[in-house]
């Protein structure tokens, strides 16, 4: 038995990521807010290009494609976690294919991206509370 203590992480919540085939997520954002009763969370980019929407403790993300058509791959899900370093170490021990090391993002999260077998990205982020202007 290994007596070495291994740090562990804790999953807090998850969000589906809908890829919007448009230069803006505005119509979809308005649909979720005005017709389905979601509240606007984060909004990034002009148009906007990305939003989070919340209702009853559940979150959905809307993201624009970077080209006119659907991207072949992109975010499929986002998990908020505690202790991103421990999760990164666990994924490396398990042989997960990671897109990059832990990365500090301007929207106040530290993230790692695991690559699914079909090429989609499963993103894990820890909120740091430090958001760039």
Where are these regions (language model features)?
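Active-site/binding-pocket entry motifs
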Residues: 59, 66-68, 130
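A short beta-turn/loop motif at secondary-structure boundaries
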Residues: 44-45, 68-69, 105-106
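Short beta-turn/strand-loop junction motif enriched in small, turn-promoting residues
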Residues: 37-38, 65-67
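Vicinal oxygen chelate
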Residues: 1-11, 13-24, 41, 51-54, 67-133
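Core segments of cupin and vicinal oxygen chelate
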Residues: 19-59
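Short, charged/polar, Gly/Pro-enriched secondary-structure boundary elements
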Residues: 57-61, 119-122
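N-terminal beta-strand motif that seeds the catalytic metal site of vicinal oxygen chelate
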Residues: 1-29, 57, 75-77, 126-133
